[in-house]
Amino acid sequence: MARGKIQIKRIENQTNRQVTYSKRRNGLFKKAHELSVLCDAKVSIIMISSTQKLHEYISPTTATKQLFDQYQKAVGVDLWSSHYEKMQEHLKKLNEVNRNLRREIRQRMGESLNDLGYEQIVNLIEDMDNSLKLIRERKYKVISNQIDTSKKKVRNVEEIHRNLVLEFDARREDPHFGLVDNEGDYNSVLGFPNGGPRIIALRLPTNHHPTLHSGGGSDLTTFALLE
């Protein structure tokens, strides 16, 4: 029974496509090696897969550059010289751009002005004025950002202060606030550790002796406890 003719077209499934590529690449390289050994031929194969991977084969008796040199000699073309000429032309353009930039920099620093005409000087002044304007705008932008950041920090500090004041006022409403008893352990009263002076805070009537005030009309006064 005759085999059906296989239709050659792109394999849509990516996995199947990669498997087929790998198998046929190995088969092609094997055939190239056999041709190189059996017939003493110089064979070079360069392949790039759909995933941009490079695969190549070169006969053991030669090198890629030698084979390209023989190709150029056989067909009468010089691939390297045309590429070199393009590189030289590109380098020439880059050098011209570099010279112009260096000249503009010197002129903006007040140098190399003798060869400039009136219109060129006017244009240079306009360019420098525009550059100065952009620099000022950038400076003001940076300062504005710093001011906004500082204002945010100030608002955060003010919010923390308000919360502390509210918490302090709320605790002042507690009649037991200011006196720490801790079940008779007076070492836990506000003060310094290691036998230092201990401090006790008492709420006094508003008409007590003025010399006992802590300042600002507050009725919360602290006393040092003696041993």
Swiss-Prot record:
Name of protein: Floral homeotic protein DEFICIENS
UniProt function note: Transcription factor involved in the genetic control of flower development. Acts in conjunction with GLOBOSA (glo).
Other facts: Mutations in defA cause transformation of petals into sepals and stamina into carpels.
Keywords: Activator, Developmental protein, DNA-binding, Nucleus, Transcription, Transcription regulation
GO CC field: nucleus
Keyword Transcription: yes
An example Gene Ontology molecular-function term: RNA polymerase II transcription regulatory region sequence-specific DNA binding
GO biological process per UniProt: positive regulation of transcription by RNA polymerase II
K-box domain span: 84-174
Gene3D superfamilies given in the database record: Transcription factor, MADS-box
Compartments where located: Nucleus
CDD domains recorded: MADS_MEF2_like (cd00265)
Entry keyword Transport: no
Lineage top rank: taxon: Eukaryota
Domain MADS-box: 3-57
A Pfam entry, by short name: K-box
